[in-house]
């Protein structure tokens, strides 16, 4: 039902200050961002290390859905987002287990479909379950071109193997000549 944790969402009053902290101090790579005029908030994704992601959300004016959450705090963890390959199956699974959910929303062209589980039903945590393609939300320089799943680059001691990461983006593996030989033998055995 759940593929992985996609991101942790942090609500903040000061988007610029948060972006500076995560990018300039912690080294996060800024990704996709947008403003939602209906619920009056701005969101931006940031990738860290192995492409773990944070989403920073902030109100864009009075009447934002974040007003109540930020009323007595400057910032805090707002929700976690879990990725599913099939939102309809996830909904049926939750219903079969008596877990209430709300907020079904399908964005235009099917780029993102979501539901939420209220904190009272999820041990104090707001959970967003969403169906989407991970690479659609990443900065271009942390992912492969469409259709590319791996890349091999020769180094002085062996090679760097870079693979498409199941959560979007790519992950690199340094291998010396001995490890490359073992990999070659394993691949030959798999093809035999």
Task: Please identify what each model-predicted range represents.
Residues 49-51, 60-61, 85, 120-121:
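Short loop segments at secondary-structure junctions
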Residues 5, 22, 51-57, 77-84, ...:
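Short, structured motif recognition centered on aromatic/hydrophobic residues
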Residues 91-192:
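Vicinal oxygen chelate
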Residues 2-4, 71-77, 165-168:
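Short glycine-enriched loop/turn motifs at secondary-structure junctions
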Residues 62-109:
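Charged surface patches that recognize polyanionic ligands
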């Amino acid at each position: 039902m759940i593929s992985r944790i996609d991101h942790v969402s942090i609500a903040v009053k000061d988007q610029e200050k948060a972006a500076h902290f995560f990018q300039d101090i912690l080294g996060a790579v800024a990704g996709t961002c947008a403003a939602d005029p209906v619920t009056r908030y701005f969101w931006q994704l940031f990738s860290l290390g192995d492409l773990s992601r944070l989403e920073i959300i902030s109100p864009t004016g009075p009447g934002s859905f974040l007003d109540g959450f930020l009323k007595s705090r400057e910032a805090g963890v707002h929700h976690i987002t879990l990725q599913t390959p099939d939102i309809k199956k996830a909904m049926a699974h939750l219903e079969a287990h008596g877990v209430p959910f709300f907020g079904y929303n399908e964005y235009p062209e099917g780029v993102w479909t979501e539901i939420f589980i209220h904190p009272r039903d999820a041990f104090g945590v707001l959970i967003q379950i969403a169906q989407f393609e991970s690479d659609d939300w990443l900065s271009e320089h942390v992912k492969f071109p469409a259709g590319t799943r791996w890349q091999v680059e020769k180094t002085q001691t062996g090679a760097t193997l870079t693979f498409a990461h199941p959560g979007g983006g790519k992950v690199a593996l340094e291998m010396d000549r001995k490890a490359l030989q073992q990999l070659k033998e394993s691949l030959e055995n798999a093809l035999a």
